[in-house]
Amino acid sequence: MSHLGYEIKKLGFGLMRLPKRGDNIDVEQVKVMVDRFLADGFTYFDTAWAYPGSEDAIRQALVERHPREAFQLATKNAAWIKCKSREEAIGQFETSLRQTGAGYFDFYLLHNLGESRTRFFDVFNMWDFVQEKKRQGLIRHVGFSFHSTPEELEQILSAHPEMEFVQLQINYGDWENPAVQSRACYEVARRHEKPVIIMEPVKGGMLATPPEPVVKIFRKANPQASNASWAIRFAASLEGVITVLSGMSNVAQMQDNLSYMKDNLSYMRNFAPLSAEEHTTIQEAQKALNSIPLIPCTTCNYCAKVCPNDIGISGSFIAMNYLTLYKDKRAARVQEQWLVGGHGRQSADKCVQCGVCEAVCPQHIAIRDELVRVHAALGDGQLAPGS
């Protein structure tokens, strides 16, 4: 289906979690992934100024190696990250042009609108700036990504009908999650007749390795289908979807996704939505998943960008979720040591309870309380709330 003048297939390459070689992005592996993605007929690539090294990597792997008209490139402006003036916010756009070498952006997004973050785009008048760049031909289509309430989304779309699309977090785990409200936000966008780009369809990888009760449900319904494919197909089955972004971190993950997006070899080059029976399977999985109390962290690491003590928040939460799911304290501690200390971060007990992280968390996690819980479960002692 055509959206905004493009024929874009239902899988987009999210460039937030690219493969690493040591501390750096493995550009050679990214080249292999890009080539395979394009060879199978997929063309949409999503990066951001705020994704460390991603724009440089996609310049080397994609822009410098393939015709510009062979792909669509999206990037984002995060005016709420360390911008004290309009000039600094505009500088992010100029940096993105330089780092990607793309010449223009097919899709340009105001990044992570919602709550206190939206006011930066208002104060710096980024709404007019992106329209100016569109008139100059440096941006083809303007939209925004969003992590907040349906009420706030309604306000933004009513105030800015010139926005052409919305990028929303939608997955079967968050469809009725009161902290995310995927369904309600999706319905607001559709009422405003805005096409939707879906992010976090696999919830930061959590739905690729769901708890065993969910795995059993999917295995019974289709033993050959991967867990991630169920999540991606759920999102792609919704009306008005431009594409579904999958943050693929290695060639194996891409192979799995492509196997469910290819022609009649499997499900989705000529895409067929989920059947009624498959929707019932998803509903059973939702019920099973919602009965397990996990920390809903997607490892976006926006919290890490603002934490004054450099706490390894997402790593701590991954380890805690592992403990919740698998009841293996030793393995969870090993995970915490690697994901936190092994990556140069501070442990949960170093949290000073300032709460800055909670203001930028797209998942609305009570981060301070959860860090207390992490330290109580995995640390050497107790961390008192409010200390």
At which residue positions do the language-model features occur?
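Active-site mouth loops of central-metabolism enzymes
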Residues: M16-E28, K76-E88, S116-R119, V214-A225
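CE4/NodB-like, metal-dependent polysaccharide N-deacetylase domain
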Residues: A39, E88-L109, Q131-Q136
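Distinct, well-ordered alpha-helical segments
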Residues: S54-E64, S85-L97, G101, T118-D128, ...
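Short, well-ordered coil/turn segments that N-cap beta-strands
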Residues: Y6-L11, G41-Y44, P67-F71, G101-D106, ...
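Short, basic, low-complexity termini and linkers enriched in Ser/Thr/Gly/Pro
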Residues: Q382-S387
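Beta/alpha (TIM)-barrel catalytic core signal, keyed to glycine-rich beta->alpha loops juxtaposed to Asp/Glu
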Residues: L113-T298, Y302-I311, G315-I318, L325-E336, ...
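N-terminal binding-site loop/beta-alpha segment at the start of enzyme catalytic domains
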Residues: M1-F71, F129, R135
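A short, structured active-site edge motif that brings together acidic residues
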Residues: E69-K82, Y108-H111
